[in-house]
A protein has these predicted regions:
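Beta->alpha loop/short-helix hinge microenvironment recognizer with preference
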Residues: 1-393
Length: 393
């Protein structure tokens, strides 16, 4: 048995995905994701070829797949998204709130991903809006960003919503109202309201016969079993987690980057691979969050990864309240004027890939790495009769 210690998610897919596909017949969007990951930066998506005008040095760059599930394609979208948020971030307190659901609901949620992921957003936003408008908590309209994650550290199925909440808002007189240094909503109240709203939507979808039941969820087609499930979920305390506040616009922007374009697992967590297994590191929350190695079969690794491929065209990052697309242009400007804070200007807006590389990494790909001359697209007739069209990365 040969063990490879320097390997990536792409390597794992190349070795184990073909057999996984034969055994499991995955849906089309899973097959597309696998194709993208296996072929990213291999030339399958086109190439950029450039030639130095002075020394003739040739540079070939394989294009990336741009899949939102590919570990090699998240940096540019993340940097552009975070940069765009600078214009809407205020120098005010922010809070990180996490909404989770009991594991008993996992099988039904996985069988109805689009519907019940949407329901998570609906319940979380309705909870925050309702409680924030209550005068005994804040009495204001707030702004927040919701981001869906579906994984735990071991790539187990664990759907939850990360929410970045502005620690203040506009009251009925359009005046700024702040939280006063601590989170304005009691965790117990958030948990109960969120539980009620999510289960209400789940019941409504059941009553309208919109739910599907596959695999271990099939038993809940029976109305009595479904009612038992709801009763059990009503009895449980749903975990709502809130991190301490973080102040300052730059801190908020940096913090956002940890959650917005994350995927189920990154390359640096893959430790080794054999002909049949993959070893990666996971957080052991029963042991104070220490990292430990976990070894599973290659096909099981693929199965776990594929659980977290979002439905086609699903929007994972959503803005609400003062930060919604409809409100942020006027209301964030008004809030900024009330708070007396400066506007942060986007630096990456309208930049192409070459310009972004220069700004982010201080590398000028238009200059030859050998002599410093200008790199240009080669002439088709000079270098190859079958030269591929020049494509932007």
């Amino acid at each position: 048995m040969i063990m490879e210690k320097s390997c990536t998610i792409q390597d794992v897919f190349e070795r184990f995905y073909p057999s996984y596909e034969k055994r499991n017949n995955p849906p089309a969007h899973h097959r597309k994701t696998a194709y993208h990951i296996m072929n990213c930066k291999t030339g399958a998506f086109g190439v950029n070829i450039s030639v130095c005008e002075d020394c003739g040095c040739i540079s070939i760059h394989n294009n990336s797949c741009r899949s939102r599930c590919c570990p090699m394609c998240q940096e540019f979208p993340k940097e552009k998204w975070i940069d765009a948020q600078k214009e809407n971030v205020l120098d005010a307190p922010y809070y990180h709130v996490v909404f989770t659901v009991p594991e008993e609901l996992n099988s039904i949620i996985y069988s109805n991903q689009k519907l019940l992921y949407d329901a998570l957003y609906h319940a979380a936003s309705a909870t925050l809006n309702e409680l924030a408008k209550d005068a005994k908590y804040l009495g204001a309209n707030i702004g927040y960003i919701c981001i869906l994650h579906t994984w735990g550290s071991a790539m187990n199925y664990h759907p939850h919503i990360h929410t970045i909440v502005l620690g203040g808002g506009l009251d009925d007189e359009n005046k700024w109202k702040e939280t006063g240094g601590k989170f304005f909503l009691p965790y117990g109240v958030i948990s109960k309201v969120f539980r009620g709203k999510y289960l209400d939507e789940l019941k409504s979808l059941w009553n309208d016969s919109k739910l599907k039941f596959h695999g271990t969820a099939e038993k809940y087609q029976n109305s009595y079993r479904f009612k038992e499930l709801l009763d059990k979920c009503y009895e449980k305390n749903w975990v709502t987690y809130c991190k301490e506040t973080f102040n300052g616009a730059q801190s908020v922007i940096n913090y956002l980057g940890k959650y917005t374009h994350r995927i189920a697992i990154s390359n640096h967590r893959i430790k080794s691979m054999t002909d049949t297994t993959v070893t990666y590191v996971v957080k052991d929350y029963k042991n104070e969050g220490c990292w430990k190695e976990k070894t599973i079969s290659g096909e099981e690794f693929i199965r776990r990864f594929m659980m977290h491929v979002p439905p086609k065209r699903f929007v994972r990052i959503r803005h609400y309240g003062l930060l919604s697309c409809r409100n942020k242009r006027k209301k964030i400007t008004h809030c900024r004027n009330l708070l007396g804070c400066k506007k942060y200007i986007s630096t990456l807006k309208n930049l192409n890939a070459v310009e972004m590389i220069k700004v982010l990494y201080h590398i000028d790909v238009c200059k030859c790495s050998s002599c410093g001359g200008n790199m240009v697209s080669p002439r088709k007739d000079k270098y190859s009769s079958s030269f591929r069209a020049h494509m932007r990365c």
